[in-house]
Each structure stands twice: as C-alpha cells, then as structure tokens.
Amino acid sequence: MTDSCTLNKKSSYTYEDLLASSRGELFGPKGPQLPAPTMLMMDRVIEMNETGGNYGKGYVEAELDIKPDLFFFGCHFIGDPVMPGCLGLDAMWQLVGFYLGWIGGEGKGRALGVGEVKFTGQILPTAKKVIYRIHLKRVINRKLVMGLADGEVEVDGRVIYTATDLKVGLFQDMSTF
C-alpha cells in the first residue's frame, strides 16, 4: 500500500491530472491508472472525500462535458446518436478504481461486477454536462484492495442511470485474475 501522504491527494482533479493518472504518474508506479482518452469518461473530478456519500465511507463526484463530436456519437447510432449506456457504467467503475488509488491502494484496477443497473434516460449530443456520483459502501484496503459502491449518472440536472454494488478490485498479480 502506498502511503497516502506521499501521493498527490487532493479533493479535486483537473483533466491534466486525470491524464497523468492514465500514464501512471498520479498515484505512484504501483497505483491504479485511469484509461487514456478516448475511453477516459470524465473531464474533471470535482469532489473526493473519505467520509461523505450516502454511507459515510467515501464520495466521488466527476463531470464530463458533452460535445457533439465525441467519438461514440458518430457510430452509436448513425442518424440516432446516443452515448452508449455501458460507457456511463464504465465511468462509474473508473471512478471507484480512482478512489482506491486515491486512498493509497496499489495494483491494476479491474471491474468485478455490478448488482443492478437502471437506465431511465439518455445522453444525446445536445446535452451539456454529465455528472457522475459515487457513494462508497465498503472499502477493503489490505492485501486485497476492493471497493463496493453505488453510483448515479446525471445529465443536465436529471438522474438517468443508477447502479448498485459497483465492485472494483486492484490486483498485484494479473495471472490470478
């Protein structure tokens, strides 16, 4: 486990910070990485803490600015552009993994599952901003590093996706996964 005091542990992160995470520079050489663009599904993290959220065990809030030229609008679907729902789900997993690195967890992050996902709206190229909110329910930070969280995706003020029991683990040895 990395000493969180040696990390660049802040309560918010810019796009440049997130790019540094994708290169493995933010949480140290053994810390988890975010994916690089175009799979990086957020532009900034605006709030992180270890005691907030619906369960008092941690909270992450991030934003994605919607631009009509985002890669998925050109192919999903031609003539009927919509952000794939799986990308919103992946963004929530990305943020759980980011949180695990933020608290000092080490290893390569992998999504391990989700309890239930509900879609009640869509993200169109006319939207302006997506907000992701992650409410940590349980964090294991020992030899096994794992986070369990609930999440939601909001577009322009309306919650359109919810997910329960988002599970992400950090692995030291990928041969066991």
Curated annotation (Swiss-Prot):
Residues forming coiled coils: none
Superkingdom of the organism of origin: Bacteria
Reactions the enzyme catalyzes: a (3R)-hydroxyacyl-[ACP] = a (2E)-enoyl-[ACP] + H2O; (3R)-hydroxydecanoyl-[ACP] = (2E)-decenoyl-[ACP] + H2O; (2E)-decenoyl-[ACP] = (3Z)-decenoyl-[ACP]
Record flagged with keyword Iron: no
Alphabetical UniProt keywords: Cytoplasm, Fatty acid biosynthesis, Fatty acid metabolism, Isomerase, Lipid biosynthesis, Lipid metabolism, Lyase
Keyword hit for Lyase: yes
GO biological process, one term: unsaturated fatty acid biosynthetic process
Cell compartment(s), UniProt: Cytoplasm
InterPro entries recorded: FabA, FabA_FabZ, HotDog_dom_sf
GO molecular function: (3R)-hydroxyacyl-[acyl-carrier-protein] dehydratase activity; trans-2-decenoyl-acyl-carrier-protein isomerase activity
Chief location bin: cytoplasm
GO cellular component: cytoplasm
Active site residues per record: 76
Enzyme Commission (EC) number: 4.2.1.59, 5.3.3.14
SUPFAM superfamilies for the chain: Thioesterase/thiol ester dehydrase-isomerase
Pathway: Lipid metabolism; fatty acid biosynthesis
Pfam families in alphabetical order: FabA
UniProt record similarity statement: Belongs to the thioester dehydratase family. FabA subfamily.
Subunit structure: Homodimer.
PANTHER family assigned to the protein according to its UniProt record, in alphabetical order: 3-HYDROXYACYL-[ACYL-CARRIER-PROTEIN] DEHYDRATASE (PTHR30272), 3-HYDROXYDECANOYL-[ACYL-CARRIER-PROTEIN] DEHYDRATASE (PTHR30272:SF8)
HAMAP family, per the entry: FabA (MF_00405)
Function: Necessary for the introduction of cis unsaturation into fatty acids. Catalyzes the dehydration of (3R)-3-hydroxydecanoyl-ACP to E-(2)-decenoyl-ACP and then its isomerization to Z-(3)-decenoyl-ACP. Can catalyze the dehydratase reaction for beta-hydroxyacyl-ACPs with saturated chain lengths up to 16:0, being most active on intermediate chain length.
Name of the protein this chain belongs to: 3-hydroxydecanoyl-[acyl-carrier-protein] dehydratase
Organism, as annotated: Mannheimia succiniciproducens (strain KCTC 0769BP / MBEL55E)
Designated gene of the protein: fabA
